[in-house]
Regions:
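Flavin (primarily FAD) cofactor-binding/catalytic cores of flavoenzymes
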Residues: 1-35, 39-42, 47, 73-351
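Redox-cofactor-proximal catalytic regions of oxidoreductases
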Residues: 36-64
Length: 351
């Protein structure tokens, strides 16, 4: 078997494969495109610290808190989480082949042919945990190519200081958009633009809210629809930082502009000059390498089945963890366990 991806979902799946009696290297291999441990966390912007991150859940069998120390709140997540993942790989003897770029996965009778830049693997089963970081999404708007300023995606963001003295248009209604809007607005002027009116959640996040959100996303993927985001169901939490930003007048949202001009953006009733457009418009699942398997259904998504909707309906040898309802870190752990259990049972191997 092959596990592609060594982020939260991939490491969880590898842990449970080993727990179910499958030995690494002889029974399964883990391939990861990054040069070091940490999944997408290693690429996050430095100001995203453990005090501002939306939550890092424990991998099975090892506490994250035990690896961070007592004064970890201001440690960048891009440092703390990769350190945790590195210790985890060593603790549970989960060798990860890296960097390995998976080019394509093709059906070959009873096996899957997995072609990479480091060679070819033949696998009876596949757990795909490639996440979304490699597929940033930027919607197309008329005039985008004429803009004389800078356009960048959340993935490219490093620090607010580089925008000092420039007017920044922040596009997007998710958690990252709100966090970066707040951060940038402390050093320069901003305009916030979203496609829909953001929904804020004043009440505390409860397990029931989380379960309801996951259930709605799970229903979509079981019906073969594109997953949608969990935050679109849960709403945005009103943190002290957001309250302070409201008081500073930063959270006054405008609807989406209709056109991008060389020096700004345009609505039907006016324009705003801009030096920078920051697209906090999310990511799409990194699944292009699976295209030869023809997994997508007529609904535009991949119809999923299994206990936690990790098994691909069109090919039970393939599980997607970190897709749809398992895209959160806590969901990824449960999905990794379910995928490992169901795949080994389907193949008739392991304990």
């Amino acid at each position: 078997m092959v596990v592609i991806g060594a982020g939260q979902a991939g490491l969880s799946a590898a842990y449970y494969l080993r727990k179910f009696g499958i030995e690494p290297e002889s029974g399964f291999v883990v391939l990861d495109h990054a040069s070091g441990p940490g999944g997408a966390w290693q690429f996050r912007w430095p100001s995203l610290t453990l005090s501002t991150v939306n939550g890092v859940h424990d991998l099975p069998g090892m506490s994250f808190a035990e690896t961070t120390g007592t004064d970890a709140e201001q440690v960048p997540a891009s440092v703390a989480v990769p350190h945790y993942f590195e210790l985890y790989e060593k603790q549970f003897e989960l060798p990860v082949h890296r960097p390995v770029h998976t080019r394509v996965v093709c059906p070959r009778e009873e096996r899957l042919r997995i072609e990479t830049d480091q060679g070819v693997f033949a696998a009876r089963g596949l757990i795909n945990a490639t996440g979304t970081w490699e597929r940033p999404f930027i919607p197309h708007y008329r005039g985008a190519e004429s803009f004389r300023g800078r356009q960048l995606h959340t993935k490219d963001y490093r620090t607010a200081a580089e925008f000092e003295g420039k007017h920044v248009v922040v596009v997007g209604g998710g958690i990252s958009a709100v966090q970066l809007l707040d951060e940038i607005s402390r050093v320069t002027t901003t305009t916030w633009v979203t496609r829909r009116e953001p929904e804020f959640r004043d009440e505390p996040f409860t397990p029931d809210i989380g379960r309801d959100a996951v259930a709605m996303v799970e229903d979509r993927v079981r019906r073969g629809l594109p997953p949608g985001s969990v935050v679109s169901v849960t709403g945005l939490p009103v943190t002290p930082a957001i309250r302070a930003a409201r008081e500073r007048g930063v959270m006054n949202r405008l609807p989406m502009f209709s056109e991008i001009l060389p020096n700004g953006v345009k609505w039907a009733d006016g324009t705003v000059d801009a030096d920078v457009i920051l697209w906090c418009t999310g990511f799409r699942s990194s699944l292009d390498h699976l295209a030869p398997l023809h997994l997508r259904g007529p609904g535009g998504g991949i119809p999923m089945t299994g206990r936690l909707a990790t098994q691909v309906e069109a090919d039970p040898r393939v599980h997607l963890v970190g897709y749809g309802p398992s895209s959160s870190t806590i969901g990824a752990n449960r999905a990794g366990q379910a995928a490992a259990r169901e795949l080994t049972a389907y193949l008739g191997i392991g304990e």
